[in-house]
Regions:
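Conserved N-terminal alpha-helix of the aminotransferase class I/II PLP-enzyme fold
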Residues: 39-88, 113-120
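N-terminal "arm"/small-domain region of PLP-dependent enzymes with the aminotransferase-like
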Residues: 2-61, 69
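Glycine-rich beta-alpha junction loops
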Residues: 17, 31-37, 186, 208, ...
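PLP-dependent enzyme catalytic core of the Aspartate aminotransferase-like
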Residues: 119-120, 128, 142, 315-319, ...
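Conserved PLP-enzyme active-site core in the AAT-like
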Residues: 2-3, 12-21, 79-279, 285
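Short, solvent-exposed beta-strand edge segments and adjacent coil->beta transition regions
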Residues: 51, 216, 304-308, 371-375
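Conserved small-domain helix->loop->beta segment predominantly found in fold-type I
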Residues: 269-345, 360-365
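Short, well-ordered beta-strand elements within core beta-sheets of diverse protein domains
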Residues: 250-259, 307-318, 375-379
Length: 397
């Protein structure tokens, strides 16, 4: 059976699975730190690389390999390297492909911890990073130097759901001799396939939609075998490895990914449309709305707007924007107050004081993250119950 001839929904259920001699129908969980050899000669061959096979779960593990193969099939990638977290996926990508003195151009509209990694950690190791507008291609072009190795973007971005032209940005990167890295966390392969649009590398925080129920931490880097070889080399040495148990959970999550993402997107579009009509809302950010600045571009790259909706709360007289945002968040009874996203449960957070709290005020302003901004990762509850939980917005005029 040639598995890749099937539709993506079928691949999410069937791709990557390997059966043991016991004939299990669900992927096996290999909770092993190491693997036995038949002889000293075989051990030497495995360690020397002349014979394929498992050695130690920091290097490879059968359950992790099945997860990697399934996600690679869904993203159309030659190879996937699974990591312990989404942040370690970014770190492994950069450390595998860049050296001291190299230059990275990154969107300023990215996750706050990603900004910290680029600005505070990698800079100490001699990497230069320039932050530019996600949507201004001229800024990307102007930022290129003779040492530029990577372009890094989130599209849609966190939390303002800005969208970049992946094909156009890939063209600029390739002409500069650089690789385009796309964090596809918000969309997943169920909604967007960056490699097909010209990107070279995909980053995932598997913690989010791939898990789908807020249980485990994990990440992934995907791309060609040539690009993934040094990324895997860093992982094997540094040990930022995905655990077998977490990989097993993510395998189960991938089986329902397409069904869940459809439901998340339907709920998110309905909620965003409703929010635009509420007097307590000053502005809504959702790429599935025709009012979104990059709506046409988003719909040409994505099959839907995804599950993340952000909006600015309109403050009442005598109330600061942050006070207005916090009042709304504290008034919710159903939606969970937490910074995670991609869960079946809807979550709500105030980016300026949570996900982007360690970013400088100047950087937040440049990224458009204002004090009245609220982000909701729309879950799988009934839409009427979500609207009811946000009913405070109907009386905030």
């Amino acid at each position: 059976m040639t598995i890749n001839k099937f539709h993506p929904q079928t691949l999410s259920v069937r791709a990557g699975s390997e059966m043991t001699a016991y004939g299990e129908n669900s992927e096996a969980l290999f909770l092993n730190s190491s693997f036995r050899f038949d002889s000293a000669a075989q051990a030497a061959a495995r360690f020397g690389g002349s014979e394929p096979g498992n050695i130690y779960s920091r290097f490879t593990n059968p359950t992790v390999t099945m997860f990697q193969n399934k996600l690679a099939a869904l993203e159309g990638a030659e190879q996937c390297v699974a990591t312990s977290t989404g942040m370690s996926a970014i770190l492994a990508c950069v450390m595998g492909l860049c050296s001291a003195g190299d230059h990275i151009v990154a969107s300023r509209s990215i996750f706050g911890t990603s900004v910290q990694l680029f600005s505070n950690i990698l800079a100490r190791w001699g990497l230069q990073v320039s932050f530019v507008s996600l949507t201004d291609l001229a800024e990307w072009q102007s930022a290129v130097t003779d040492h530029t190795k990577l372009f890094f973007v989130e599209t849609p971005s966190n939390p303002l759901t800005e969208v970049c032209d992946i094909a156009a940005l890939a063209d600029i990167a390739h002409k500069a001799g650089a690789q385009l890295v796309v964090d596809n966390c918000f969309c997943t392969p169920a909604i967007q396939q960056p490699l097909a649009l010209g990107a070279d590398i995909i980053i995932h925080s598997a913690t989010k939609y791939i898990d789908g129920q807020g249980r485990c931490l994990g990440g992934a880097v995907l791309g060609s075998k040539a690009l993934m070889e040094p990324v895997y080399g860093f992982l094997r040495t540094a040990g930022v490895t995905m655990s077998a148990f977490n990989a097993w959970v993510f395998l189960k999550g991938l089986e329902t990914l397409y069904v869940r993402m459809d439901a998340h997107a339907r709920n998110a579009l309905a909620l965003a449309t409703w929010l635009e009509q509420q007097p307590g809302v000053a502005r809504v950010y959702y790429p599935g709305l025709s009012s979104h600045p990059q709506y046409a571009l988003a719909m040409s790259q994505q099959s839907s707007g995804g599950g993340i909706v952000s909006f600015e709360v309109r403050a009442k007289a005598g109330q600061t924007p942050q006070q207005a945002a916090w009042a709304l968040i504290d008034a919710t009874k159903l939606i969970s107050i937490t910074a995670n996203l991609g869960d079946a449960k809807s979550t709500i957070t105030h980016p300026a004081t949570t996900t982007h709290s360690r970013v400088t005020a100047e950087a937040r302003t440049a990224a458009g993250i204002v004090d009245g901004l609220v982000r909701i990762a729309v879950g799988l509850e009934h839409i009427d119950d979500l609207k009811s939980d946000l009913s405070m917005l109907t009386a905030l005029a």
